[in-house]
Regions:
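P-loop NTP-binding/switch modules centered on Walker-like glycine-rich loops
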Residues: 65, 186, 190, 194, ...
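Conserved ABC transporter NBD signature motif
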Residues: 73-84, 355
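Conserved ABC ATPase "signature" region
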Residues: 84, 136-155, 264
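ABC ATPase NBD coupling module
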Residues: 85-102, 128, 250-255, 287-293
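A short, proline-enriched helix->beta-strand linker immediately N-terminal to the Walker B motif
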Residues: 179-183
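Charged, flexible cofactor/metal-binding loops and thiol motifs
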Residues: 248-352
């Protein structure tokens, strides 16, 4: 697998503008996701990458309308095929889920119902969303299972999830997501629970099927190797905010935000990790985002090379915690900084060739 080439001017399937998610906790309000913007084009793979807990999965659940009841979602725009999902009733959303948009979850063993056979679970979306007889639906299920590499498919229909390997279960989930030919698939770390060999097979399968069906994919991961292999565009997420976005080649060759450069520095390079060359790390800890977070979210995590001559984020409080500075490096590469101190420091480090 290699990096994909971005095709311009794709029809936008998903558009998210100023999405925020707040969750009440015992200490106050957790601002889990704050004012993020993203879009996915038809036939495009957008990878959202970031550490565990940065809000990636919550973002996907918010799009699907599957957030827990205590989570509050607000968005200026949340559109699938130019239809605002926020205006739909729960019944209307149920008609869209599994039909026009589908989701592949991280762990197929807990996503598939252990009490029903594979056949019953795959027939359900077709019988619910398509006007098909059970016999025709069954034929489509068999065809799709064979398409995702489960051959022969018919004997598997009578099996239960626990009778399949992890790789086969994930292939079943991929088949289920594609049965109704959706416009958008959200894949939430679908290969994390698999070994590297099966992971490579699943990624290759998803890419080939995505091209065959011209489906837009929002792919959530923390693995930069996966991003390099499958992404058209990348959105880097940190502490509930998207800090950088752009074509995969731009993000890997010209990372601009200090967090993105830190992630790149953590990728092990064969032959360069030994007694004198340690694995790269990002200093400090991810901040708590409970209540009004008015200081720099990346403050205190800058590389020591920068901090020798500069003190990043001397601002301890900002007039508006949701203010940000956006820098267009080119028409497709956008970087977000939370304050002007970070902006100027990052510009200096880029000019010096650091990072």
């Amino acid at each position: 697998m290699g990096a994909r080439t971005l095709i311009d001017k794709k029809e936008v399937v998903l558009e998210v503008k100023n999405l925020s998610i707040d969750i009440p906790v015992s200490q106050g309000v957790l601002h889990a996701v704050e004012n993020i913007n993203l879009h996915v084009g038809r036939g495009e793979i957008l990878c959202v990458v970031g550490e565990s807990g940065c809000g990636k999965s919550l973002t996907s659940l918010a799009i699907m309308g599957l957030l827990p009841k205590n989570a509050q979602r607000t968005a200026e725009r949340l559109e699938l095929n130019k239809k605002d999902l926020q205006e739909l009733t729960e019944r209307q959303l149920a008609d869209i889920r599994g039909n026009r948009m589908a989701m592949i979850f991280q762990e197929p063993m807990t996503s598939l119902n252990p009490s029903f056979t594979i056949e019953n679970q795959l027939l359900e979306p077709l019988l619910r969303h398509k006007e098909l007889s059970k016999a025709d639906a069954r034929n489509q299920v068999i065809e799709m299972l064979e398409l995702v590499g489960i051959k022969p498919a018919e004997p598997r229909l009578r099996q239960y999830p626990h009778q399949l390997s992890g790789g086969l279960r994930q292939r079943v989930m991929i088949a289920m997501s594609l049965l109704c030919n959706p416009d958008l698939i959200i894949a939430d770390e679908p290969t994390t629970a698999l070994d590297v060999t099966i992971q490579a097979q699943i990624l290759e399968l998803m890419m080939s099927l995505q091209e065959k069906f011209n489906t837009g994919i929002l792919f959530i991961t923390h693995d930069m190797g996966v991003v390099a292999n499958i992404a058209d565009r990348v959105a880097v997420m940190y502490a509930g905010q998207i800090v950088e976005e752009g074509p995969v080649s731009e993000i890997f060759n010209n990372p601009a935000h200090p967090y993105t450069r830190g992630l790149m520095g953590c990728i092990p390079v064969p032959g360069k990790v030994g007694q004198d060359n340690h694995l790269g790390t990002i200093p400090g800890m991810v901040p708590s985002v409970v209540n009004d977070f008015k200081s720099c979210r990346f403050g205190g995590r800058w590389d020591e090379n920068y901090k020798e001559n500069f003190k990043p984020c001397r601002l301890t409080e900002m007039p508006n915690s949701r203010r940000s500075y956006e820098v267009n490096l080119n028409e497709k590469h956008l970087v977000h900084f939370c304050c002007d101190e970070c902006l100027h420091l990052s510009e200096h480090s880029l000019l010096e060739g650091s990072g």
